[in-house]
């Protein structure tokens, strides 16, 4: 991983470093015989290649558009330059751009976990240098506007065509420098972001490669532990089931034996009761005969007395004799 980041930093240093080119004396001192109107009316060439996507790029695009409007040197621009409004607006846009660049850098640096600290410090230093160059260019624009404002105020009532021509030329150069350093910073941040993404992907891949065998081992070990833990439990359950089954069978056999004993005892009791009943019946028959012998004479005597009584009653009332009651046997 360290070798990868080292190669990435070398490529960044070799391919993206761009020093600010000093302006030539010829560009600093334009010949006064240049045609002022031609310089003022020359259209600003479009900046192909600049693509705004990140917040800092959008902020820089607003700075760029405002600077292009200032370069037109229209009457409104002249009024706002003299009132210091242009300088204030450029300062606001510049600070906003620097703030967005700083926030974007901080966001990328938070994602640099896999990068070595030495490599991270080197890359951060290069980004800081590119950011400083862009800030210097933007401050040069603001300084040049302040100088132009002072020169215009000093030449009130005089022709400022030559002054405006020089200012327009300087603004074109400054805009080119801003564009060049902005593109340089954009490339460095793109390489920085690509390195962060690649490092994160490699880290995830490395973690997956390292963790997958460990996960497989853990899964296999867990399966073995489950098997070992389940086997004794199953054997224990089977043993308990057999013990319970044996006890139930033993209790059932005991219950059946007890029922058989109870049944035998009941049969014995029943037999004894029948025997006793027969004995009592046999013993009662002589007693019954004896009682019958005792009461039959009394009954016959009572029947005779009843018949005599009835005859007397009939004779007294003069009715036919009534048949005496007959004992039903």
Curated annotation (Swiss-Prot):
List of residues that carry Methionine sulfoxide: 155
GO biological process terms held by the UniProt record: acylglycerol homeostasis; cholesterol efflux; cholesterol metabolic process; lipoprotein metabolic process; melanosome organization; phospholipid efflux
Assembly and interaction partners: Homotetramer. May interact with ABCA1; functionally associated with ABCA1 in the biogenesis of HDLs. May interact with APP/A4 amyloid-beta peptide; the interaction is extremely stable in vitro but its physiological significance is unclear. May interact with MAPT. May interact with MAP2. In the cerebrospinal fluid, interacts with secreted SORL1. Interacts with PMEL; this allows the loading of PMEL luminal fragment on ILVs to induce fibril nucleation.
Stated name of the protein: Apolipoprotein E
Source organism of the structure: Arctocephalus gazella
Gene3D superfamilies: Apolipoprotein
Residues holding heparin: 174-177, 241-248
GO cellular component entries: chylomicron; extracellular exosome; high-density lipoprotein particle; low-density lipoprotein particle; multivesicular body, internal vesicle; very-low-density lipoprotein particle
Location of the region described as LDL and other lipoprotein receptors binding in the Swiss-Prot/TrEMBL record: 170-180
Region: Homooligomerization, residue numbers: 278-329
Coiled coil: none
UniProt function note: APOE is an apolipoprotein, a protein associating with lipid particles, that mainly functions in lipoprotein-mediated lipid transport between organs via the plasma and interstitial fluids. APOE is a core component of plasma lipoproteins and is involved in their production, conversion and clearance. Apolipoproteins are amphipathic molecules that interact both with lipids of the lipoprotein particle core and the aqueous environment of the plasma.
Sequence repeats: 92-113, 114-135, 136-157, 158-179, 180-201, 202-223, 224-245, 246-267
Post-translational modification: APOE exists as multiple glycosylated and sialylated glycoforms within cells and in plasma. The extent of glycosylation and sialylation are tissue and context specific. Glycated in plasma VLDL.
Xref: InterPro entries: ApoA_E, Apolipoprotein_A1/A4/E
